[in-house]
Amino acid sequence: MGLEKSLILFSLLVLVLGWVQPSLGRKPSVQDFKRQHMDPDSPPNSRPTYCNQMMKRRGMTKGSCKRVNTFVHESWATVKAICSQRQMTCKTSSRNNCHKSSSPLHITDCRLKGSSKYPNCDYTTTNSQKHIIIACEGNPLVPVHYDASV
């Protein structure tokens, strides 16, 4: 009887760990979005080293150089509010969960220079004000993917 109870408890433990374990160590997509694209505390600036520093600081040059990335210099509330705009088809995929900002936002585009190779990732820094298109998911909707600038 004791062995039977132990086997049942062990089976339940394995089952519970099977459900819980995949979510351990995996960041929610909204956290990835914030890490990769949000920089509300820095105004856009023309420092040519901005992208090199930020891409490294935010972990986008580990193992390889991320080719393109955009930082948004607006509050999280402003960016999150874009999710309440009209839904549209994304520019970079056929998904239909994208939303376009109603006004231009301050952004910095970082593009890997053609001659740059890992581990010496070297980026061009371009500041502008553009509408952004983001993918939103969840309930309530939150940004999970930066799709495009227009």
UniProtKB/Swiss-Prot annotation:
| Cysteine-cysteine disulfides | 51-110, 65-121, 83-136, 90-98
Indicate the enzyme's highest-level EC class.
lyase
| Matches recorded under Pfam families | RnaseA (PF00074)
Active-site positions on this chain: 37 (proton acceptor), 145 (proton donor)
Q: Which GO terms describe its molecular function?
A: lyase activity; nucleic acid binding; ribonuclease A activity
State whether keyword Disulfide bond applies: yes
| Keywords, ordered alphabetically | Disulfide bond, Endonuclease, Hydrolase, Lyase, Nuclease, Secreted, Signal
Subunit structure, as described in the record? Monomer.
**Protein known as:** Ribonuclease pancreatic delta-type
List the InterPro entries. RNaseA, RNaseA-like_dom_sf, RNaseA_AS, RNaseA_domain
Annotated signal sequence range = 1-25
Q: Which family does it belong to?
A: Belongs to the pancreatic ribonuclease family.
Q: Which reaction does it catalyse?
A: an [RNA] containing cytidine + H2O = an [RNA]-3'-cytidine-3'-phosphate + a 5'-hydroxy-ribonucleotide-3'-[RNA]; an [RNA] containing uridine + H2O = an [RNA]-3'-uridine-3'-phosphate + a 5'-hydroxy-ribonucleotide-3'-[RNA]
- Species this protein is from: Rattus exulans (Polynesian rat)
Q: What is its EC number?
A: 4.6.1.18
Role: Endonuclease that catalyzes the cleavage of RNA on the 3' side of pyrimidine nucleotides. Acts on single-stranded and double-stranded RNA.
A GO BP term here is: defense response to Gram-positive bacterium
A GO cellular-component term linked to this record: extracellular region
According to the lineage, what is the superkingdom? Eukaryota
Q: Where is this chain primarily localised?
A: secreted
Q: Answer yes or no on keyword Aminoacyl-tRNA synthetase.
A: no
Q: Which PANTHER family match?
A: RIBONUCLEASE, RIBONUCLEASE PANCREATIC
Localization, UniProt: Secreted
Residues noted as binding substrate in the record, renumbered to the chain: 35, 66-70, 91, 111
